[in-house]
């Protein structure tokens, strides 16, 4: 039930609008903290899609740790918790994707016994849910063992809704999917649905960059292709002061400007688009910073011959695989003067040690700016992996748990899982 001393107005005006519009009203959003769960059962959609090794042991528990605060809040209120999640992409019921493999890890992290039921709907699930006492946690079997989950089936969602009194969405990683457990189920909790603490913080962090940022704002966009970042580039031009371009897409811009890029990655059909983006940025007084030099190699290998060359003077037979030393200095200077920083995508092929220095130097610059008071948000699978690999996880303000979901928010798109709570 809602706490009587907390005012939590509903979003009565939402249908299909951009994320960038409604997150401006972030302080009106109902979260877990707006409810008292005493004697109540919280049905929480979490994202426990974690990596497992060959022995079915969790190798990265970040997503489980991220969900802990929401679970503990319910338990401390005197409520019980029913957790639902997916794991991998099973085709039907496959043991390797069973969530029973992660029960011990969830139990270890939360600090209380975690019960498990080998189904997520039906008599077994209902009975297990009914037997829950205050302070207990139940983990349901993999939602994707049923095709109805990804189809957004209403009947399946209705069965899920029978397992709890209050619906909580705390799975940012799947918020961009209109699945039964992330979107459809919310309709069965018209007055008893809210955001989990993790999902709220994700929205809050992105909002801080897009709509409530302290200037100057710098966005760092890396990755292989311009085509994968068009939406982001278009949406943030009105919101940032600087855009740093890195990764493979650098060379599409460089070639569009007439540079010689050798065998570097390029999207030939996006050269005009690259020029258009540069023109739009100039018209909006947004400075785009391209790498001025690169570590080039004669093969895509740690054993390749390498040298440092200007990005527009790469000869045939050589390819740019990382940013150079002058670029590191230029980018660090821009970042040091920034008050808000968004990092989405690495600058080079950091997975190969020989081409990781540009990404490491970028991480150092962001970490230093953060220690000096800047707000820094890191998101996107590869950049998050880089942050973890090089030890920057605790040196930035926030590391997002959602790759595709964050990208769609940065593009200004509405996310079904978020709209379902707001509507």
Label every PLM stretch briefly.
Residues 1-11:
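Positively charged N-terminal leader segments that act as targeting/secretion signals
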Residues 11-28:
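Short, Lys/Arg-enriched N-terminal segments with co-localized hydrophobic residues
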Residues 26-423:
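Active-site loop-to-helix "anion-binding N-cap" substructures in soluble metabolic enzymes
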């Amino acid at each position: 039930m809602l706490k009587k001393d907390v005012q939590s107005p509903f979003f009565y005006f939402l249908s299909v609008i951009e994320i960038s519009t409604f997150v401006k009203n972030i302080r009106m959003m109902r979260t877990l903290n707006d409810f008292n769960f005493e004697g109540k059962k919280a049905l929480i959609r979490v994202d426990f899609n974690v990596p497992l090794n060959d022995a079915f042991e969790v190798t990265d528990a970040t997503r489980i740790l991220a969900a802990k605060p929401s679970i503990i809040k319910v338990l401390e209120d005197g409520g019980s918790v029913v957790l639902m999640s997916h794991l991998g992409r099973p085709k039907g019921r496959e043991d390797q994707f069973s969530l029973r493999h992660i029960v011990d890890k969830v139990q270890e992290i939360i600090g209380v016994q975690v019960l498990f039921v080998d189904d997520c709907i039906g008599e077994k699930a209902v009975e297990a849910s009914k037997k829950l006492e205050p302070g207990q946690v139940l983990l349901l079997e993999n939602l994707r063992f049923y095709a109805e989950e990804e189809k957004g089936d209403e009947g399946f969602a209705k069965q899920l809704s029978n397992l709890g009194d209050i619906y909580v969405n705390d799975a940012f990683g799947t918020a961009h999917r209109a699945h039964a457990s992330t979107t459809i189920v919310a309709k069965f909790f018209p007055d008893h649905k809210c955001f989990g603490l993790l999902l709220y913080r994700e929205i809050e962090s992105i909002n801080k960059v897009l709509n409530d940022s302290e200037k100057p704002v710098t966005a760092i966009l890396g990755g292989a292709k311009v085509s994968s970042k068009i939406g982001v580039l278009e949406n943030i031009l009105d919101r940032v002061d600087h855009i740093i371009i890195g990764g493979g897409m650098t060379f599409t811009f460089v070639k569009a400007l007439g540079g010689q890029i050798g065998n570097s990655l390029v999207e030939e059909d996006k050269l005009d688009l690259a020029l258009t983006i540069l023109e739009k940025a100039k018209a909006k007084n947004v400075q785009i910073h391209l790498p001025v030099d690169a570590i080039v190699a004669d093969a895509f290998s740690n054993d390749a011959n390498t040298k440092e060359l200007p990005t527009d003077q790469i000869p045939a037979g050589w390819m740019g695989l990382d940013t150079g030393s002058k670029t590191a200095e230029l980018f660090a200077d821009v970042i040091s003067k920034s008050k808000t920083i968004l990092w989405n995508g690495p600058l080079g092929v950091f997975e190969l040690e020989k081409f990781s220095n540009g990404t490491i130097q970028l991480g150092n610059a962001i970490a230093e700016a953060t220690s000096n008071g800047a707000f820094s948000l890191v998101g996107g699978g590869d950049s998050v992996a880089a942050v973890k690999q090089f030890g920057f996880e605790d040196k930035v303000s926030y590391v997002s748990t959602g790759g595709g979901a964050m990208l769609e928010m940065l593009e200004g798109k509405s996310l079904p899982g978020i709209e379902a709570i707001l509507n």
